[in-house]
């Protein structure tokens, strides 16, 4: 992979910060990115930053926590586009964020300094996993990653501080890699088998209000399931609970954090007609999402990856 990741992150990060200002947050920024074979490029979007540079909101004494990131989308030509939150419950106009992503199979954002803003992204390219920081050259994490058909980071699942990575292999076994905070990963730990029943696995932060990062998974029948996090890498999830059915109307489900800037992680879903819907998080395990709100009328089927 070439050293430049092609991710143009500075402008996107600035726009995300602008959205946060409407929620009385302090803006921050970041630089352009890099990566290695055929070099995907990525830029950080302007995201809304948190108060005092931390991942806590200043509005309440016991402020809610949720990461705030742009939604990145990769089109069929390998171009990457960034959609930061607009501070009004939706997404801002897209901006170009990178190129040469034709060979990227999976991608997911990661926050390594626990400030609530992504610092870069892991990208599975062929049989390699690369980490693309927003402010320096890419890092080759390892080889042999073509055994995985799903790679996603839901946040800090193991309790150590930095974001971790989940990977599902072809036989349906889900594995957890703990993050060192620099893009590198520990050895893998087995989460469990039978995960090939799910078409989508995603998450970005705490969905249930207990301070532990969670995930949701959509099965082939269209049922969405919640896996509450434990914060223990040896057993990172509790038993699943049903969120609801009818999710087979969507061909993509992804979480990048808090879209509506209310301090709670949200979920985005794209239907088969290319419309985009936002499911606002509630922070409650019994009913983790509010009713959907359309935030994109069409055209989202042009993207083969969203992260």
Feature map (PLM): residue ranges:
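Trp/Gly-enriched beta-strand/coil motifs that build multi-repeat beta-propeller-like domains
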Residues: 2-307
């Amino acid at each position: 992979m070439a050293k430049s990741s092609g991710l143009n992150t500075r402008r996107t990060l600035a726009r995300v910060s602008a959205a946060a200002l409407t929620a009385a947050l302090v803006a921050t920024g970041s630089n352009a990115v890099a990566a290695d074979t055929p070099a995907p490029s990525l830029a950080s979007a302007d995201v809304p930053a948190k108060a005092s540079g931390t991942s806590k909101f200043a509005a309440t004494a016991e402020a809610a926590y949720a990461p705030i990131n742009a939604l990145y989308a990769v089109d069929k030509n390998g171009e990457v586009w960034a959609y930061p939150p607009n501070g009004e419950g939706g997404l801002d106009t897209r901006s170009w964020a990178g190129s040469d992503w034709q060979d990227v199979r999976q991608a997911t954002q990661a926050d390594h300094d626990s400030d609530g803003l992504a610092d870069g992204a892991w990208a599975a390219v062929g049989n390699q996993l690369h980490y693309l920081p927003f402010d320096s050259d890419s890092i080759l994490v390892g080889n042999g990653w073509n055994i995985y058909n799903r790679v996603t980071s839901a946040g800090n699942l193991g309790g150590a501080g930095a974001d971790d990575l989940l990977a599902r292999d072809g036989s349906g076994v889900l594995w957890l890699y703990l993050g060192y905070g620099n893009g590198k990963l520990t050895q893998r730990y087995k989460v469990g088998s039978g995960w090939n029943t799910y078409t989508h696995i995603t998450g970005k932060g705490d969905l249930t209000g207990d301070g532990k990062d969670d995930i949701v998974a959509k099965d082939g029948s269209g049922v969405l399931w919640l896996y509450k996090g434990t914060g223990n890498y040896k057993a990172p999830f509790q038993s699943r609970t049903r969120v609801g059915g009818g999710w087979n109307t969507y061909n993509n489900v992804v979480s990048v954090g808090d879209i509506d800037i209310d301090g709670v992680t949200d979920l985005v879903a794209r239907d088969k007609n290319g419309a985009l819907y936002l499911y606002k998080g509630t922070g409650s395990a019994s009913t983790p999402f509010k009713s959907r709100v359309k935030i994109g009328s069409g055209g989202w089927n042009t993207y083969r990856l969203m992260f």
